[in-house]
């Protein structure tokens, strides 16, 4: 135990000999401890240095990712501009004299011969003083690939005009370099990847009894964290993550009660069948999915037309008024793993792809139509639906926490306005591919399929007028946010368009959207109990009466014509909850979807229950009525959609599915019924023919659905935060918006000029539809 070279003290009588030995040993132990402490300090300094270097590398990674994305967009822009200018020259040249034609042709040919020396000189002139040489070299290399690439045919732009949003040729290069310089200067908060994925994994496990809304809003706030909040201290990060998790578990104000518990699914059952899940951007969904552990629940936030469920193992959440809902059906994933790292579980890079490919195949960067991009790129970018305006959106790069300052500046460099991620799809307004081509290299496979009576699926060849023509919107613009203060499970718009009604926990708020600056409701209608969610609210055609239903056995009828809104009557049923409401066109009858599966029919004049349609074996979740008032359509948690003859009071048809039905809408012009599934699909059925369309742009359950009053298009919203607008019936994607949380409800104004959505972010959003 002691060193051999120690000199023991001589033994003296009357004095114990071990005293000196113990003291010396203590000194040696102290010395060794101090040595180890110094060594530990040295290692800690080295560790901090490595952590700093790692963070710096991650910053560089995000910077180059931004650069590659910007370069790719710029390359496609310049290719398209050059092609159109070339076409204009070709049209003008015949008007010149023969001599001038030859001179112009030679000048055009000379202009096409761009050498590397000229490219380097151009980049050197345009480069900013603080732009690192490596970035200039990268740009030169990238541009040289574009300059010497093979010629590729592009679909012509209608009318040959330059689409809005493409900057002039002279300013494009400087805008691109500004982005590169910005990337080199910006301080990007990039979290430790391992901790980030661990946190997301714990998020999914902790979502058994919580709605997706808290996690969605927290992710959005994480994406907006400034660089000053990023800490290199692992201890501090662990404390922050612990705090974050406590926020998930303790946020009682979010939609804890809006969960459909499907945690009893069979782990051996495939999550998604291949025929229902086309690949995205060349990566098959089934490969990209992270396999959930057997005990990992799949929680589904519900909409105003979606059934409610209390988590059965949370006594404080249990309410006798709302039954727990169970599902034995296979359930798709609810949250895709965060792309961006090659070591993410379940994300395997394809052979030959450069690192970082997975980040570029993120759902937010998908191409909605099966149109080949101008040419396949090393990054498989192609055209992106979020390209126009959504560079400022925090959801563009999932898993990469890019500061909003940099995103906004990058958008400014490209001349885009600060608005949510809508896609006017100018490139889609061209003839599309034949049905035989299901996938194009560098583009997204088809998302709309025709399913024949025998079950054969074929991609849909869209007609030339799929996205153009009278009554077809080009995009939508967010014009107002209504801060309700609770999760908004129900929305409706008055006719004429002036007021918006938002239903949350225990109350409906009325907003006047005719005044743009209005930030507070004009009235509040307290309904049900304070802790019970409103699930549906419907206005009678005269706009003077509002009917409200939710997590209670009573429906409340409000008189809005009086000086202050008052309760005119209450309708009480035997079911503990109402999930959805419909009003007959003559305003005499109200239909309510009950949690026991029955459809209650109410006489509004006499305020009595006149009939019940019985058929659904589980909760009836959604409802719509035909324009002539003769037929009723209902969807349920028993995986069926049923139609009812209102004159004869009997069931007409039943459609069976493999997934719970969360939303549906019947086309005002007749023929078509759109159905939103728990499985993330939207299916468009014909009311008499057996064939149908299946649409695959949502990544999680489809929570609400509404047809435009013209019948030419409809919108759907989902737990994936998306608002999708589709062409009736074949489902060409008209535009898409990504919100910051699950979109639980939606409505369209009677003039088809406005859309309102209700969100898990405790707000409603008003969009103006642009034609």
Swiss-Prot record:
Region feature SP domain, mapped onto this chain: 279-451
Top-level taxon in the UniProt lineage: Eukaryota
Low complexity composition-biased segments: 137-148, 207-217, 294-309
Biased composition (Polar residues): 320-332
Similarity comment: Belongs to the WD repeat Groucho/TLE family.
Subcellular location, principal: nucleus
Pfam families noted in UniProt: TLE_N, WD40
Gene: tle3b
Listed GO MF terms: transcription corepressor activity
Biased composition (Basic and acidic residues): 196-206, 219-257, 282-293, 310-319
Main function: Transcriptional corepressor that binds to a number of transcription factors. Inhibits the transcriptional activation mediated by CTNNB1 and TCF family members in Wnt signaling. The effects of full-length TLE family members may be modulated by association with dominant-negative AES.
Stretches the record annotates as CcN domain: 210-278
Annotated GO biological process: myeloid cell differentiation; negative regulation of canonical Wnt signaling pathway
An example Gene Ontology CC term for this record: transcription regulator complex
Phosphoserine PTM sites in chain numbering: 296, 299
Region (Disordered): 137-174, 196-360
Region: GP domain, residue numbers: 142-209
Motif (Nuclear localization signal): 235-238
Chain intervals for the UniProt region annotation (Q domain): 1-141
InterPro entries per the UniProt record, alphabetical: Groucho/TLE_N, Groucho_enhance, WD40/YVTN_repeat-like_dom_sf, WD40_repeat_CS, WD40_repeat_dom_sf, WD40_rpt
Organismal lineage: Eukaryota, Metazoa, Chordata, Craniata, Vertebrata
Name of the featured protein: Transducin-like enhancer protein 3-B
Tissues expressing the protein: At gastrulation, expression is absent within the axial mesoderm. After gastrulation is complete, expressed in the presomitic mesoderm, but expression in the tailbud doesn't begin until the six to seven somite stage, after which it becomes abundant. Expression is abundant throughout somitogenesis within the posterior half of the somites, but is absent from older somites. Also expressed in a dynamic manner within the neural plate.
WD repeat windows: 483-521, 529-568, 573-612, 615-654, 656-695, 697-736, 738-771
Keywords assigned by UniProt, alphabetized: Nucleus, Phosphoprotein, Repeat, WD repeat
Localization terms from the record: Nucleus
